[in-house]
Amino acid sequence: MTAIAPVITIDGPSGAGKGTLCKAMAEALQWHLLDSGAIYRVLALAALHHHVDVASEDALVPLASHLDVRFISTNGNLEVILEGEDVSGEIRTQEVANAASQVAAFPRVREALLRRQRAFRELPGLIADGRDMGTVVFPDAPVKIFLDASSEERAHRRMLQLQEKGFSVNFERLLAEIKERDDRDRNRAVAPLVPAADALVLDSTTLSIEQVIEKALQYARQKLALA
């Protein structure tokens, strides 16, 4: 009988630190990694590369079903590999973002990508980062973590990130945007942002990233009986 690969799901709102935690855990455990937030951007970029109409659901479904994408974390840096090519920077362009919002609107595309995400489940295990990983994509995952932080703390972190890149930012505007996104995510009809019933809710508001990683790894190893 083939062993089923264990999955650790990391869900939570924007800016809680999911990506950083996901990369750290994948490196510590030497497991595979899935950044579900990037999947729609990767599909949009693949469509642009292959001249597939991003407004055609029929054309997008087969592309989504066989999307050749991998995520590799090295020293805290995430590489997004599409068809053997590093597209980490390319998926962040405005053109790709616009196309991603189009492809994400199609139900059959979302269903195809759901199956594609589940295919990331390979031995020795998978760390899955998203918003509905523990509730929709991998409801049977043995370890589920819901990483949260106050909206003020998440706005503060985002402000520091943008300032480091040389952008001038308004804290109140950032905070309003985060609260608006939270409200939209938590109240949407399909796959709302809520912790799975069996998830560890980890509030990172007053914790350093090192403390978050330590707590998450300790919990995962305990649940999985890993050395």
From Swiss-Prot:
Catalysed reactions listed for this entry: CMP + ATP = CDP + ADP; dCMP + ATP = dCDP + ADP
MF GO annotations: ATP binding; CMP kinase activity; dCMP kinase activity
Keywords for this protein: ATP-binding, Cytoplasm, Kinase, Nucleotide-binding, Transferase
Superkingdom of the source species: Bacteria
Residues that coordinate or bind ATP: 12-20
UniProt-listed GO biological process terms: nucleobase-containing small molecule interconversion; pyrimidine nucleotide metabolic process
EC number of the protein: 2.7.4.25
Cell compartment(s), UniProt: Cytoplasm
GO CC annotations on file: cytosol
Top EC group: transferase
Chief location category: cytoplasm
Keyword Transmembrane assigned: no
Family, per entry: Belongs to the cytidylate kinase family. Type 1 subfamily.
Protein name: Cytidylate kinase
